[in-house]
Amino acid sequence: MRALVTGAAGFIGSNLVDRLLADGHGVVGVDDLSSGRAANLDGARGQSGFAFVEADVVGADLIGLLAEAKPEVVYHLAAQIDVRRSVADPQFDAMVNVIGAVRLAEAARRSGVRKIVNASSGGAIYGVPKNYPTNEAAPADPASPYGAAKLAAEAYLNSFRHLYGLDCTHIAPANVYGPRQEPHGEAGVVAVFARALLAGEPTTVFGDGSNTRDYVFVDDVVDAFVRASGDAGSGQRFNVGTGVETSDRTLHTVVATEVGAPDQPRSAPARLGDLKRSCLDARKAEMVLSWWARVRLDDGVRATVDYFRGC
């Protein structure tokens, strides 16, 4: 299979590129390197089945790019992922996350692409749900422009499916962590703790430490993207998570124990807009995609800490 990955130099995108190449597929990686790191693709660059194009989904000639690459499947992971930036500059967020997706869909349907596997959001789309773990039937109620944009991108891609037969599936991950994660931002808290504790620097837990997230290892998330490239799940969203809530304070203990560092984070006031809880029900992915989370938190944290030890 010939595949194209947008956001290929990013955390999840680069791990997906490696998986696709290991599975024997040809891969074209596309990234503007505004947030992705070229070094994440060092292993891929040495392989004959990989080609890289530095371009962004908003301004590039995507029709020409896809016509030349001739992918069967496009994995769309290029995005503006900072929720706080989406609040500060919703127009920029919409330009990247909505217009970028629309431009990609238009280019894909003109270029004979069979399917787009789209990276959605497992937390931001649902806002503050009534039930945990949260399944895909929960009402979409985004509490941020980022969540609204991700939901809009799903709707646009689904409309192209109805109008032109361009297949699509949406993967909505929980809080992804693992090697190559950038050590900043709320979503990168495992990497933030790991890097700081390894360096002997202070760490911070916001609020009383009871906020919970559903932490899912990057290899498991990549596996969901790969499984979604077939015919199953056409036009549907799939939550990808463990169904287990881990508090900020507990997570710090897990990372500190793996590092061998004191489990003594500083406390800071809760941050405005932070969700109190987030946890996903992934039983639909189990039933339709035969996917489930295989990596336990302690094993995933160990792999992440080992990665940062070597950086």
Task: Show which residues each predicted segment covers.
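Hydrophobic alpha-helix immediately C-terminal to the catalytic Tyr-X-X-X-Lys motif of short-chain
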Residues: 152, 156, 160, 193, ...
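Conserved donor sugar-nucleotide recognition element shared by glycan-biosynthetic enzymes
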Residues: 145, 153, 186, 248, ...
